[in-house]
């Protein structure tokens, strides 16, 4: 039996991409899974696909009341909450400082930080009492942009660096009751969109990047799928497999940190 059997897991942005892969994986692990999802169509799809195995709540991660409504439903359904996974986010499609008008930069900053940083903070606030009671955990999705430049423009990169600070501070404030960690995936097959303020709300990340372009820059030389990143979340959520980690950010970058100066990887001819 899985360590996560009957564990109560709350994931934001579970309707597509990494969020959907996490929903699938935790259901496979036997967990009771809930998600807060902005899109009504995706909520309906989740309910149709997973039935009683999913509690799908329509709501916005920038709204504390929506979080609280979801947590109330989770506690009614499961009687507890064991793990909160803050995952919903938006990307800036590499919008640069020089080429982005000042007014757009300002409005884009507020929209992107509201989702990528405030959304995590509000989720932590809503979930903290239940997680303190269960001595559970929080896990936040980062990005390779939390470590390196060029994984987005200054707005996205700054938001992911802000999230690392949030993880460390929450890990400090909530210890010893709650473990707080992060996972930073690299580029993957996803429907990640951009801010409306930048005119990117209908533009998917895969319209800016190609599988070949992503694979070429990774030393492991493959195009990751969302399911490839779910393992670290499962490990961090497990009390048996993770008693000791808090304030830790797992850099799941397919080897970006070991790219060579002359070649992406030295073993390409092996």
Curated annotation (Swiss-Prot):
Q: What is catalysed by this protein?
A: 3-(cis-5,6-dihydroxycyclohexa-1,3-dien-1-yl)propanoate + NAD(+) = 3-(2,3-dihydroxyphenyl)propanoate + NADH + H(+); (2E)-3-(cis-5,6-dihydroxycyclohexa-1,3-dien-1-yl)prop-2-enoate + NAD(+) = (2E)-3-(2,3-dihydroxyphenyl)prop-2-enoate + NADH + H(+)
Q: What residues make up the catalytic site?
A: 156
Q: Show the InterPro entries listed in the entry.
A: BphB-like_SDR, Dihydrodiol_DH_HcaB, NAD(P)-bd_dom_sf, Sc_DH/Rdtase_CS, SDR_fam
Residues annotated as binding NAD(+) are: 10-34
Q: Which GO terms describe its biological process?
A: 3-phenylpropionate catabolic process
Methyltransferase as UniProt keyword: no
> What highest taxon heads this organism's lineage?
Bacteria
Q: Which pathway or pathways does this protein act in?
A: Aromatic compound metabolism; 3-phenylpropanoate degradation
The protein's enzyme class: oxidoreductase
The keyword Transmembrane is annotated on this UniProt entry: no
Tell me the GO molecular function terms. 2,3-dihydroxy-2,3-dihydro-phenylpropionate dehydrogenase activity
Write out the residues that bind substrate.
143
Q: Which SUPFAM superfamilies match?
A: NAD(P)-binding Rossmann-fold domains
Q: What is its EC number?
A: 1.3.1.87
Sorted keywords for this record are: Aromatic hydrocarbons catabolism, NAD, Oxidoreductase
Q: Which family does it belong to?
A: Belongs to the short-chain dehydrogenases/reductases (SDR) family.
The task this protein performs is described as:
Converts 3-phenylpropionate-dihydrodiol (PP-dihydrodiol) and cinnamic acid-dihydrodiol (CI-dihydrodiol) into 3-(2,3-dihydroxylphenyl)propanoic acid (DHPP) and 2,3-dihydroxicinnamic acid (DHCI), respectively.
Q: HAMAP family given for it?
A: HcaB (MF_01647)
Q: What is this protein called?
A: 3-phenylpropionate-dihydrodiol/cinnamic acid-dihydrodiol dehydrogenase
> Corresponding gene?
hcaB
């Amino acid at each position: 039996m899985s360590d996560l059997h009957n564990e109560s897991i709350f994931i934001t942005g579970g309707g597509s991409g990494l969020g959907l892969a996490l929903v699938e994986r935790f259901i496979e692990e036997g967990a009771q899974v809930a998600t807060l999802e902005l899109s009504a169509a995706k909520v309906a799809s989740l309910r149709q696909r997973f039935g009683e195995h999913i509690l799908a709540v329509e709501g916005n991660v920038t709204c504390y009341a929506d979080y609280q409504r979801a947590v109330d439903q989770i506690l009614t359904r499961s009687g507890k909450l064991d793990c909160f996974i803050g995952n919903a986010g938006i990307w800036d499609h590499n919008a640069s400082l020089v080429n982005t008008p000042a007014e757009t930069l300002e409005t884009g900053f507020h929209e992107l930080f509201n989702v990528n940083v405030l959304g995590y903070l509000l989720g932590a606030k809503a979930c903290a009492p239940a997680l303190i009671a269960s001595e559970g955990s929080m896990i936040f999705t980062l990005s390779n942009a939390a470590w390196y430049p060029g994984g987005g423009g200054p707005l996205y990169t700054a938001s992911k660096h802000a999230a690392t600070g949030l993880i460390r501070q929450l890990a400090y404030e909530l210890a010893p009751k709650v473990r707080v960690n992060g996972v930073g995936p690299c580029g993957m097959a996803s429907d990640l969109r951009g801010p409306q303020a930048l005119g990117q709300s209908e533009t998917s990340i895969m319209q800016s990047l190609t599988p070949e372009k992503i694979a070429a820059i990774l030393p492991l030389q493959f195009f990751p799928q969302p399911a490839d990143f779910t393992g670290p979340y499962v490990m961090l959520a497990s009390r048996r497999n993770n008693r000791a980690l808090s304030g830790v950010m797992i850099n799941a970058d397919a080897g970006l940190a070991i790219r060579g100066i002359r070649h992406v990887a030295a073993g390409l001819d092996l």
